[in-house]
Amino acid sequence: MGAVPLKNNKPVEAGVRTVTVLGATGSIGDSTMDLLRGAPGRYRVEALTANSNVEALVKLAREFAARFVAVADPARFGELKDALAGSGIECGVGESAIIEAASRPADWLMAAVSGAAGLKPALAAVDRGTTIALANKECLVCAGDFFMQRAAKAGACILPADSEHNALFQALSSGNRDELTRVIITASGGPFRTWAAADIEKATLAQALKHPNWSMGRKITIDSASMMNKGLEVIEAACLFTLTPDEIDVLVHPQSIVHGMVEFSDRSVVAQLGTPDMRTPIAHCLGWPERIVGPAAKLDLASIGQLTFEAPDFTRFPALRLAYDALRTGNGATTVYNAANEIAVAAFIGEKIRFGAIARLVEATMNGWVRAGNLAPLASADDAIAIDHNARNMAASLLPQIAAKAT
């Protein structure tokens, strides 16, 4: 299992634990800070970072007496310095400062910087051998094998903070890796689960943002509507738990109560359940190897009444099929998959393409990448970032013809 601990055999740390939160003002960061707020005296905040939300960062820095804060956007640095003048809190700006925050001594770090920008800071924490709650998808989708190998070499402990992967992480502790036969990741099906393909094709932005169960950011909500997010999770699961594509199944589960299941060789299936609240998997990571008191609502199965499941439709939701294709292709294909999707979603939000064109742009970019002979194994973070950059450019160049095509 590499850097992901299969068994909870890490000694319990005595005393106050130091924590760093990268991406403290985003949705994952907000949930993390809420959990820290609910455990006064148990944790001390070392560093906090944000992309550009200086107002929220300053409030958190003062509330938690952080020792170091950093903002990625250079245009906001003056505001940050002025707001914290005389506080004794160190301030930094730009990528180097985010990396510095990740490099500072901490017992536990939340890696929640979104996008490819989160890769180098996460690697900096890995190199310190830190226990990392990983919420950044790009670390695994763009540089999975390289990232996990480096983590194992450095002795870093990677804890999956995403709800589905955290569910698998918990269920896997019921057996040994060589006893595993498959894992099952659940998907709500999103707002278009029952829609016809023709209706999905022309879905509006407002419709795509109406997720039935989860409260999330704009980008991930659109990814959930296309099931691109589930495709990314398939890729992440393969990297985290050293799985082949054939060992990973996706099951549509509209209630979002069962988050993941693991099947073992004796055909026992162990599942993790909980209300759809991101604070639950984050609390599991924050307390690990113990468990802390979480603020999520208690699960009441009697009031829910029914849990239903159905097979995913790879025809109506081609983004999921493309994830398996990218995983089997390897050699940077998953990086291309993610990068092209970023361009496609931005184009959809900007009303440049229809919803149905998101997956078509991703597929066209992947096919173009393979035809150009660009496939090559990743040897460094810079390799992953370069592929991400070049794939974005290719997707952007293909965008006009994809937008022009009638369906």
From Swiss-Prot:
Catalytic activity of the protein: 2-C-methyl-D-erythritol 4-phosphate + NADP(+) = 1-deoxy-D-xylulose 5-phosphate + NADPH + H(+)
GO MF entries: 1-deoxy-D-xylulose-5-phosphate reductoisomerase activity; manganese ion binding; NADPH binding
Enzyme class: oxidoreductase
First and last residue of the signal peptide: none
Coiled coil: none
Binding-site positions, Mn(2+): 162, 164, 233
Binding site for 1-deoxy-D-xylulose 5-phosphate: 137, 163-164, 188, 211, 224, 229-230, 233
Binding sites annotated in the UniProt record for NADPH: 25-28, 53, 136, 138, 217
Metal-binding listed as a keyword: yes
Pathway named in the protein's UniProt entry: Isoprenoid biosynthesis; isopentenyl diphosphate biosynthesis via DXP pathway; isopentenyl diphosphate from 1-deoxy-D-xylulose 5-phosphate: step 1/6
Pfam families: DXP_redisom_C, DXP_reductoisom, DXPR_C
Cross-referenced Gene3D superfamilies: 1.10.1740.10, NAD(P)-binding Rossmann-like Domain
Organism domain of life: Bacteria
Keywords of the record: Isoprene biosynthesis, Manganese, Metal-binding, NADP, Oxidoreductase
UniProt-listed HAMAP family: DXP_reductoisom
Role summary: Catalyzes the NADPH-dependent rearrangement and reduction of 1-deoxy-D-xylulose-5-phosphate (DXP) to 2-C-methyl-D-erythritol 4-phosphate (MEP).
Protein family: Belongs to the DXR family.
Protein name: 1-deoxy-D-xylulose 5-phosphate reductoisomerase
Organism: Nitrobacter hamburgensis (strain DSM 10229 / NCIMB 13809 / X14)
Lineage, opening ranks: Bacteria, Pseudomonadati, Pseudomonadota, Alphaproteobacteria, Hyphomicrobiales
Gene transcribed to yield this protein: dxr
